A protein has these predicted regions:
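Acidic, Ser/Thr/Gly/Pro-rich low-complexity segments and short DxT(G/T)-type signature motifs
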Residues: 408-413, 433, 497-557
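Beta-strand cores of secreted/periplasmic/IMS beta-sandwich domains, seen most often
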Residues: 57-58, 63-64, 72, 586-612, ...
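Short, surface-exposed alpha-helix to beta-strand junction/turn motifs within ectodomains of secreted
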Residues: 431-470, 495-502, 511-514, 612
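Beta-propeller domains with acidic blade repeats across secreted/periplasmic ectodomains
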Residues: 26-411
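N-terminal edge beta-strand
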Residues: 408-409, 566-595
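Extracellular/periplasmic metallocenter environments
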Residues: 103, 554-559, 642-691
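Extracytoplasmic beta-sandwich strand-turn segments characteristic of Greek-key/jelly-roll folds
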Residues: 458-475, 618-667
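A short glycine/threonine-centered beta-strand motif
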Residues: 423-436, 484-486, 497, 600
């Protein structure tokens, strides 16, 4: 591998301009200021190469190795475009099965295929792999969702790999571990020995080794209220009970059993042979994972929750920012990708009373496709491999490879948040304006958590505002200590700082963080602070006002046929979903002012809705839905805007909703859109209104 550059035949990028295309943002609506600090460059991909990144690693000579979901491995020389010359792509291996991880070791490449951990070598130095060795293989059932990820190397030289659960046939919503070690993390040695490590994963797409410790990223789904990052130790149970099917095996280190979970949380399993009933959210509060963990030793709760729809919808890779300052002031912190929303979040950790905890804040969004894998270049830049086939993404492209470069300018950001015995300490990258920092009305802290249940995802529960009673700004202006009442252990705390400014009067680049408070530290409580009292908060708008706040004769969501429609609707439509974030009908044609009955059915595996909006407003409505924040799910991700003409409820997988509305009186092309977070870019259709 050391002389790989000289030995591979090169594939010239014919017809592509020198260098890279600069991408200031995915679209004009994204915060332009992000690009002032971390610019994005799009690597050109030769025609005919489908570069759906499943694995990505930097080689010792600075080249990249990229493994694709289609089973190819490419070597990309000169990825940073030095001397204004093009990158070169060379196929190193092919014929593998859906690679979703890649590592370099001693001149070879090691990757997770669907059913095995494989090591490939170029023994004759001709630039192509000629030896494919099985390091360790595991059984598969053939279900499409049995993805395998990794490896990542532990300090002792062994590797971690993880595997998805499958789903049922008739009960297609229910995660299943059909064969051994699905839904587990496994430790594998280079000589092919496997040790089951931890159970309870659902879709563990990201593996991170941080200071020698193993962390993994999880996706929202059944039993998973939202995405998160968890510190994993041998014997941990991580939350999804399907993999506990194998916990009785003698080689299993996991002590939790399915009965421990099912006796405390009803799994609502359909009987063999049916009827098959998909579990839906119940009005009762239920239990949170941490509450079950108090009763069942061995359950590991997340170190950092990533609120669904806010910091992503499909958590992917984990990487650690190098401490050499080539990538700005955040050295040692994590970056966590999100495939569905085409973004990266930044995570800062601390350890309190033996437990990892910390916060997350948005870092960079606007990638061209779904963020799947990340690797660091020798110059300190970040390469981001992307894909969205079958999964969908906010980014519009099927695949992409981009480079994120620190421009040298320091953004005004939350550097980190630390838990205190009586509140939080927030550290910033620049000194704050003291007047704005001491204004209690410029802060807003809300604690909340998710349900632990067999339903896909969870609404926010137990959300309560936390009163700020005191503020103290450090002498250098870079730290603000908050005295906070109402903090709760194991809860997520949304910390919003919309009023904070730096010395130049600039607002934070990203003003909201989400801190998971697993333990309150001991220590000295705050003294010498400025006592404060917040102004009364405005009462939240009622959901009814949200649904009916317009001047139409019909409510924006009318679910029964209006009594004046004695002859019934003029036109009836059934609209469905297709994989990849699409409606099954791209256009509906209606007459101006006609009476419409529309039923939307959701056959997808994630929630969707239908909003009919005014011309040209689909993207702004989609962004407004994301900005609903913690209230988004409660409001069905339907913002209270005049541009929203009619809408369904938020429809869970397998569900349907019927609405009645009057078609616009003015002919033209209107848009219908799904505003569930991350969907609005691609999930759109046209309502063509004719005279």
């Amino acid at each position: 591998m050391k002389d790989i550059r000289r030995q591979f035949s090169r594939l010239f990028l014919i017809g592509l301009s020198l260098g890279f295309s600069q991408l200031p943002a995915q679209n004009k609506s994204l915060p332009a200021t992000e690009d002032n600090y971390y610019s994005m460059q799009r690597l050109p991909i030769p025609e005919g190469i489908v570069l759906e990144a499943g694995g990505l690693v930097t080689l010792p000579n600075g080249s990249l190795a990229l493994a694709t979901r289609r089973g190819d491995v490419w070597i990309i020389d000169n990825p940073d475009g030095r001397n204004n010359t093009r990158p070169y792509y060379r196929k190193f291996a092919s014929g593998l099965h859906e690679i979703l991880g890649l590592a370099y070791y001693d001149g070879d490449l090691i990757m997770a295929q669907r059913s095995e951990l494989t090591r490939i070598k170029d023994t004759n130095k001709d630039g192509r792999a000629d030896v494919y060795e099985t390091v360790y293989s595991w059984p598969v059932s053939g279900h499409y969702h049995e993805y395998s990820y990794g490896p990542r190397f532990l300090p002792d030289g062994s590797m971690i790999v993880t595997g998805n659960v499958a789903f049922g046939d008739n009960d297609w919503w229910a995660g299943q571990s059909r064969v051994p070690w699905r839904g587990w993390a496994m430790r594998v040695t280079l000589d092919g020995k496997m040790e089951p490590w931890a159970a309870g994963a659902r879709s563990p797409a990201g593996i991170g080794i941080v200071d020698g410790e193993f962390f993994y990223s999880e996706n929202q789904g059944d039993w998973m209220g939202s995405g998160y990052i968890t510190h994993v130790e041998k014997g941990d149970f991580l939350g999804h009970p399907a993999g506990l099917r194998w916990a009785d095996r003698p080689e299993s280190p996991v002590k939790v059993r399915q009965s421990d979970i099912y006796s405390r949380v009803d799994p609502r399993i359909s009987p063999e042979g049916g009827p098959y009933v998909k579990p839906e959210n119940l009005p009762e509060r239920g239990k949170a994972l941490f509450e079950v963990a108090k009763e069942v030793p061995g359950i590991k709760t997340p170190a950092v929750w990533l609120p669904h729809g806010i910091l992503g919808i499909s958590t992917s890779d984990i990487t650690t920012i190098p401490k050499d300052h080539l990538f700005g002031p955040f050295g040692g912190q994590m970056l966590v990708g999100d495939q569905g929303q085409s973004k990266i979040s930044r995570v800062f950790l601390e350890k309190v009373k033996g437990q990892y905890q910390g916060g997350a804040v948005l870092f960079r969004e606007g990638f061209r496709s779904g963020v799947m894998r990340m690797t660091w270049g020798h110059d300190g830049s970040l390469y981001v491999g992307q894909t969205n086939r079958g999964w969908g993404s906010t980014g519009p492209d099927d695949y992409a490879l981009q480079r994120v470069v620190y421009t040298g300018r320091t953004p005004f950001e939350i550097l980190k948040i630390s838990a205190q015995p009586d509140g939080f300490e927030i550290e910033f990258t620049q000194p704050v304006d003291k007047a704005s920092a001491e204004d209690v009305n410029g802060y807003d802290i809300t604690g909340f958590i998710y349900k632990y249940h067999p339903v896909y995802g969870s609404p926010v529960i137990d959300d309560q505002n936390c009163a700020i009673k005191g503020i103290k700004v450090s002498s250098d202006g870079k730290k603000v200590r908050l005295l906070v009442e109402g903090l709760r252990e194991k809860y997520i705390h949304e910390i919003k700082l919309p009023g904070l400014k730096n010395g130049e009067g600039n607002a934070l680049l990203h003003n909201t963080a989400y801190y998971t408070l697993n333990a309150v530290p001991d220590g000295a409580k705050l003294t010498g602070y400025k006592a404060v009292k917040a102004a009364p908060r405005n009462a939240p708008e009622a959901a009814a006002a949200h649904a009916h706040g317009h001047t139409s004769k019909l409510a924006k969501r009318t679910v029964t046929q209006p009594s004046e429609w004695s002859g019934g609707p003029d036109q009836t439509f059934v609209l469905g979903t297709e994989p990849g974030l699409h409606f099954d009908k791209k256009e509906l044609v209606v007459k101006a002012g006609s009476r419409i009955k529309l039923t939307m059915t959701n056959t997808d595996d994630m929630p969707h809705n239908f909003l009919l909006v005014t011309r040209g407003s689909a993207n702004s409505v989609g962004e407004a839905a994301i900005n609903l924040g913690l209230k988004g799910n409660e409001l069905g991700y339907v913002p209270d805007l005049p541009s929203v003409l009619s809408h369904t409820k938020l429809i869970e997988p397998g569900g349907a909703d019927t609405i009645y509305f009057i078609a616009p009186s003015e002919p033209g092309e209107y848009t219908y859109v799904c505003t569930y977070p991350g969907h609005y870019f691609s999930m759109q259709g046209t309502l063509k209104v004719v005279p």
